[in-house]
Curated annotation (Swiss-Prot):
Record's keyword annotation contains Metal-binding: no
Protein family: Belongs to the MS4A family.
Name of the protein: Membrane-spanning 4-domains subfamily A member 3
Topology in the lipid bilayer: Multi-pass membrane protein
Entry function: Hematopoietic modulator for the G1-S cell cycle transition. Modulates the level of phosphorylation of cyclin-dependent kinase 2 (CDK2) through its direct binding to cyclin-dependent kinase inhibitor 3 (CDKN3/KAP).
Extracellular side: 71-81, 146-175
Tissue specificity field: Expressed specifically in hematopoietic cells and tissues.
């Protein structure tokens, strides 16, 4: 009889204190919408770092092409209409700065997924996507102007062969810049979509799994 009372007392104390791991602590229930990477697999962090590295390489190539186009301005100053885009917009410079900044922040946010780095990376990628759209418009306009200038090379007072040569080089370089800009736009949109998808999933988990009431 005494043994039964001891067993009942042990069961009562076990139920009062709860079994280990049966109740989640406040740290487990407190999930932040601003930290979508913490609870995700490692491949998402690696994906974010890869996208950031692509942005950095893309920015370096855009800057290099812009410098090359600018260097052609001086020896062939009479063909400046092929390179007006480089000097009047300056897109290869400030575009490369934005793209390199967003890529660097994405890499850092993948390594250290804190709230501050994630917010900075998200905002910078939105800015880079906007810059890429503006750059696409500038480059498309430059290609259209170059095509019209190439058609007038035959009636030019200078050397028609040199005019065609410079126009072809400018068109090729600007077309390559346009391809890199479109690639940057796709990368930034993919990064933004990944953040939004992770935040939406975390928000649904918080709504569907509220803390247990005492």
């Amino acid at each position: 009889m005494a043994s039964h009372e001891v067993d009942n007392a042990e069961l009562g104390s076990a139920s009062a204190h709860g079994t280990p791991g049966s109740e989640a602590g406040p740290e487990e229930l407190n999930t932040s919408v601003y930290q979508p990477i913490d609870g995700s697999p490692d491949y998402q962090k690696a994906k974010l770092q890869v996208l950031g590295a692509i942005q950095i390489l893309n920015a370096a190539m855009i800057l290099a092409l812009g410098v090359f186009l600018g260097s052609l301005q001086y020896p062939y100053h009479f063909q400046k209409h092929f390179f007006f885009f480089t000097f009047y917009t300056g897109y290869p410079i400030w575009g490369a700065v934005f793209f390199c900044s967003s890529g660097t922040l994405s890499v850092v946010a993948g390594i250290k997924p804190t709230r501050t780095w994630i917010q900075n990376s998200f905002g910078m990628n939105i800015a880079s996507a906007t810059i890429a759209l503006v750059g696409t418009a500038f480059l498309s306009l430059n290609i259209a102007v170059n095509i019209q200038s190439l058609r007038s090379c035959h009636s030019s007072s200078e050397s028609p062969d040199l005019c065609n040569y410079m126009g072809s080089i400018s068109n090729g370089m600007v077309s390559l810049l346009l391809i890199l800009t479109l690639l940057e736009l796709c990368v930034t949109i993919s990064t933004i979509a990944m953040w939004c998808n992770a935040n939406c999933c975390n928000s649904r988990e918080e709504i569907s799994s509220p803390p247990n009431s005492v």
